[in-house]
Amino acid sequence: EAKELGIYFIVLSGGEPTVYPDLFEIFRRHPDVGFMMYTNGTLIDDEMADKMLEAGNISPAISLEGFRESTDARRGEGTYDKIMAAMDRLHNRGIIFGISVTVTRQNADELFATDNFIDHMIDKGAIYGWSFHYIPIGKDTELEMMITPEQRAQLAYRVPEIRRKKPFFLADFWNDGTFTGGCIAGGRRYFHINAKGDVEPCAFVHFAVDNIKEKSLKEVLQNPLFRSYQKRQPFSKNMLAPCPIIDQPDALRSIVLESGARPTHPGAETVLMGDIARFLDILSYNWQKASAPINKQRNKKTRKHQEKFEKVY
């Protein structure tokens, strides 16, 4: 169904995709589709690396939190060394792979304040990276892990600088709204299907109207939740504040209310009401103030590039 709609790039997350027994059979059945999977990397041994090479249409994005101490503290002792060994196996076989990092108040400097971490990933053979800001969803959320507006402002300058200067593509899903025209979720360019089959606007927006086991993909993408989402996009003229969870929380409240969407797990509604919601309201207000001058500067640069383009063509 996805291919019938023109979708030829599919991302797998978890849990851990590499424990799924029929994983490589899916890759073999769809050689015309490009797959990327978020993985902890610990199961990528020589046999699995050979299977990836044979398939030719899968790129792993390996999750880590920084260097050894930070990664092992969150993911278990010895994980970092297993990841480094997995990267060597992938690199030696010429398999395209990248990394995935969750940026928190505690590890933001370790990841991006200097070139050390990115340079190490380049040396290991990674060519791309996804930067996810910590979002307070799921069980036992810790608001003190969320990056501050000041840290986020630093990332708004630092991530594009890395792209310009390094042979490494780094994307920041929250600060790169300038380049994507705002939020890409809600079926505009992307949507998420969870393990139960609930079709959500985004991997972080845990609300749904339909389940993929009950309706076709085409039907689901035209449901009230996706229509309500898309008619509001972009959620702000400030493209550095594109997210309806942490940047425009009133938008998500309106979408859920209007569409009648249900939470896809207990506790998902905490981003809409209660202490977490109040925290996000304050955080979004502070980020609007901090990001406004950066957004203005980016818009000015964009206009200059457009003028140059028009003169050439």
Regions found by a protein language model. Give the residues of each.
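Radical SAM/AdoMet-radical enzyme domain recognition
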Residues: 2-13, 20-132
